[in-house]
Design a protein with these regions (language model features):
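Juxtamembrane and boundary regions of transmembrane helices in multi-pass small-molecule transporters
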Residues: 9-32, 40, 96-116, 265, ...
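Intrinsically disordered, low-complexity non-transmembrane regions of multi-pass membrane transporters
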Residues: 21-82, 106-151, 209, 213, ...
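Transmembrane helical segments that form the transport core of multi-pass membrane transport proteins
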Residues: 120, 126-127, 165-180, 200-205, ...
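Interfacial loop-to-helix junctions that mark the boundaries of transmembrane helices
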Residues: 76-85, 140-149, 170-185, 300-310, ...
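Hydrophobic transmembrane alpha-helices that form the pore/transport pathway of multi-pass ion
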Residues: 216, 220-280, 291-292, 476-494, ...
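Hydrophobic mid-bilayer segments of alpha-helices in multi-pass membrane transport proteins
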Residues: 87-105, 112, 147-165, 180-193, ...
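Membrane-interfacial loop-to-helix junctions in multi-pass transporters
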Residues: 82-86, 179-186, 212-225, 256-268, ...
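Alpha-helical transmembrane segments
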Residues: 83-97, 179-192, 269-272, 302-321, ...
Length: 548
C-alpha cells in the first residue's frame, strides 16, 4: 500500500468501526432529522407520519410539501428549491462516480511520472538502490487518487465541509453515528479475509474440481464450473464470500496466464453479473434482497420460486454464450498450464531453493502456490469460522470477535497457511463505507423516480440506477415508496440484481472481485470495458426475469 494512503485507510476504517459501535448506545431526539425524511415532502403538516418522522423540527418545513399532482421533474425541482443541500450532495456523489471512471487514467499518469523520475536519476548517476527508495511525491499522489477504493471515502471530506457549511458539525456527526450503518463494510472485510485463506480456497477448488471433472478438468471445464457454481453458492455463504473465492480461483486458473483483454473483461463482467443474481435463491445472502425481505415478507420459498431458478438459467445461458465466443483461448491456456507444471514448487529441485537464492517476492509467490496437503481438521476449523461469520453477519461484535480468534488459529497453523492479506479487504470495506455515506443522501431524487414508473420501465430504470448507486440502496428506497404494487416490487428487485455487474459500485461484492483481479489489468480495471463485458449477460438476465 502506498505510504501516503496508509494512514488515510487506517483512520478511515477505525472511523467506520467507532461510529458503528457508538451508534449502538443511543440516538438523538432533540434535533431536526438529517437528511430530510421523505415523509416531510409527501405528508401533510401535523399528520401522524409527519410528526413521527420529526418533520416538525425542520426549519421552514411548511415549504417542503411536494406539489400535488406534480410530475417527477416538478417534484425534484421543488425539493431542490426547498433544500438546496439536496443538489449539492448529489453533485458531490456524481463527481465521485466520475472520479471512479478516471481512476485508471490517474494510475497510468502515476506510472509515467515514476518512470520519468527514474530515468532522470539514472542519468544523474544514482544507484539502483537509491532509485528504488526515492519515490516522487507527485507519483504517490496520483497513485492514491487512482485507487478506486479510495474515491468515495475521499469525497466524504468534501461532503463534510459542505454539511458543516449548510448546517453544523453536530449534524454531520449525528448522520455518521446514528443514521448510517457500517455493518456491511465490516462484514465484507472479515468474510474476504477468511474466504481468501489457503485452506478455504483449496477446499473450494476441490469442490469445484468435482464439477470440472465432468469436462476432464480442462480449462474450459474449470471456467464454466467456477462461473456457474460459485455464484449460486453465494445464496448460502453470502455474495462477498462467493465473489472472493471465485475471483481467487479465476486468478489462479486463468488470469495469471495473461489472457486477451476481451477474455479478461468478459470474464470479470460475467463474474460480477452472475454473483449479483446468484444470491437470489435465498432471502438472506444478497444485500438488495435482504433490504426488502422483511418489509415485504419475502421468504426463501418466494425467492427461489420467483427469482432463483430464473437466475440459475440466466447464468447457464450467459456462460454458454461466452464459452462459445472464447473457446479458442481455453486450449491456449491449457498448453501454458502444461509448461508451468514442469516448474511446480513441489518438485525436488525447487524445494531445495532457499529464500537467499531467489528474490523474497519470488520465493513467497512460489510458496503460496505449493500443493502440499492441508490436514482435514484445519480446513474444517476454517469452514466453521466462515459459517460463524455468515451466521452472525448482522452482529459486528460476534463476527469481529470470531475474526480475532481466527487470526490466532492461523498463527498456530502457520505451516499450512499463506500470508494473511488484509490490505485488499480493508480497502474494499473503506470503499463500501464511503458509498454508504454518499448513498444515504440520494433518496430525495431516487424514490420519486422509482415510484412514478410502471413495471417494465421501473425494472429498466432500476437496472440503470444500479450502475451508479449500490443496488441495495435502490431496493431499500423502494421499500419507502408507499403502496407499491407487487409487480412493481418484483420489477425493482429484478432490475437491481440484473444491473449489479455493470460497474464496480453496482453491487457490494464487486469491489472485492476487483481488488483480487485488478492487478491483472494494465492500470487497473477500465470501467467502460467492464461495462461492455457485463452488458451481454445483463441483457440475458433481464430477459429471463422479464419474460419467464
Amino acid at each position: 500500500m502506498y505510504r501516503f494512503a496508509k494512514w488515510f485507510f487506517t483512520l478511515g476504517v477505525l472511523g467506520l468501526v467507532s461510529t458503528s459501535i457508538y451508534s449502538s448506545v443511543g440516538g438523538q431526539n432533540d434535533r431536526a432529522p438529517f437528511p430530510v425524511p421523505l415523509s416531510c415532502y409527501s405528508e401533510d403538516l401535523g399528520s401522524a407520519k409527519f410528526i413521527e418522522a420529526g418533520c416538525d423540527k425542520i426549519h421552514n418545513v411548511e415549504n417542503y410539501r411536494d406539489p400535488v399532482g406534480g410530475s417527477v421533474g416538478e417534484i425534484l425541482s421543488h425539493r431542490i428549491s426547498a433544500n438546496s443541500f439536496n443538489l449539492i450532495a448529489s453533485l458531490i456523489f456524481l463527481i465521485a462516480i466520475l472520479h471512479t471512471f478516471m481512476a485508471n487514467k490517474l494510475t497510468a499518469k502515476a506510472h509515467l511520472i515514476h518512470e520519468e523520475h527514474d530515468e532522470r536519476m539514472k542519468a544523474a548517476g544514482a544507484s539502483e538502490e537509491e532509485i528504488k527508495h526515492d519515490i516522487p511525491f507527485k507519483a504517490e499522489l496520483f497513485h492514491f487518487l487512482g485507487e478506486v477504493e479510495v474515491v468515495f471515502g475521499m469525497w466524504v471530506i468534501a461532503l463534510l465541509f459542505v454539511t458543516i457549511g449548510f448546517f453544523d458539525w453536530t449534524t454531520f456527526k449525528n448522520y455518521m453515528v446514528y443514521d448510517r450503518v457500517f455493518i456491511e463494510p465490516m462484514f465484507v472485510v472479515v468474510i474476504m479475509a477468511i474466504a481468501s485463506t489457503r485452506p478455504v480456497v483449496k477446499f473450494a477448488e476441490q469442490l469445484l474440481g468435482l464439477a470440472a471433472g465432468i469436462g476432464g478438468h480442462s480449462k474450459a471445464a474449470w471456467w464454466f464450473s467456477i462461473l456457474l457454481i460459485a455464484p449460486l453458492l453465494g445464496s448460502f455463504i453470502t455474495e462477498p464470500a462467493a465473489m472472493t473465492i471465485a475471483a481467487l480461483l479465476l486468478a489462479n486458473q486463468f488470469y495469471k496466464y495473461k489472457p486477451s483483454s476481451g477474455f479478461a473483461y468478459a470474464t470479470i463482467g460475467l463474474l460480477f453479473v452472475n454473483v449479483s443474481v446468484g444470491g437470489t435463491l435465498t432471502h438472506f445472502a444478497a444485500p438488495p434482497v435482504l433490504m426488502v425481505a422483511a418489509p415485504w415478507n419475502w421468504d426463501m420459498g418466494f425467492m427461489a420460486g420467483n427469482f432463483g431458478w430464473k437466475a440459475a438459467l440466466g447464468i447457464l445461458i450467459s456462460n454458454a454464450l461466452y464459452f462459445i465466443i472464447f473457446r479458442g483461448q481455453f486450449a491456449k491456456m491449457g498448453k501454458q498450464d502444461d509448461v508451468e507444471a514442469s516448474a511446480n514448487f513441489d518438485t525436488p529441485e525447487v524445494q531445495t531453493l532457499k529464500p537467499g537464492q531467489i528474490s523474497h517476492e519470488e520465493f513467497e509467490a512460489r510458496w503460496a502456490e505449493r500443493e502440499t496437503p492441508i490436514p482435514w481438521w484445519i480446513t474444517l476449523v476454517h469452514l466453521c469460522f466462515l459459517a460463524w461469520t455468515v451466521f452472525n453477519a448482522h452482529y459486528p461484535v460476534m463476527f469481529i470477535s470470531g475474526m480475532l480468534f481466527f487470526l490466532g488459529f492461523m498463527s498456530l497453523t502457520a505451516t499450512h497457511q499463506n500470508k494473511v492479506e488484509l490490505k485488499g479487504p480493508i480497502m474494499v470495506g473503506f470503499f463500501l463505507g464511503g458509498l454508504i455515506i454518499h448513498g444515504g443522501l440520494q433518496a430525495w431524487w431516487i424514490a420519486p423516480v422509482l415510484g412514478s414508473l410502471a413495471e417494465l420501465p421501473l425494472m429498466l430504470t432500476a437496472t440503470i440506477l444500479t450502475a451508479v448507486n449500490d443496488n441495495a440502496a435502490i431496493t431499500y428506497l423502494a421499500t419507502l415508496v408507499p403502496n407499491l404494487a407487487e409487480a412493481s416490487k418484483y420489477a425493482v428487485v429484478a432490475g437491481a440484481v440484473t444491473g449489479g455487474g455493470l460497474t464496480v459500485i453496482a453491487n457490494a461484492p464487486n469491489p472485492a472481485g476487483q481488488s483480487i483481479l485488478g492487478r491483472f489489468f494494465e492500470h487497473g480495471v477500465n470501467p467502460l470495458k467492464l461495462l461492455l463485458g457485463a452488458l451481454v449477460p445483463t441483457i440475458i438476465m433481464g430477459i429471463c426475469f422479464m419474460v419467464l
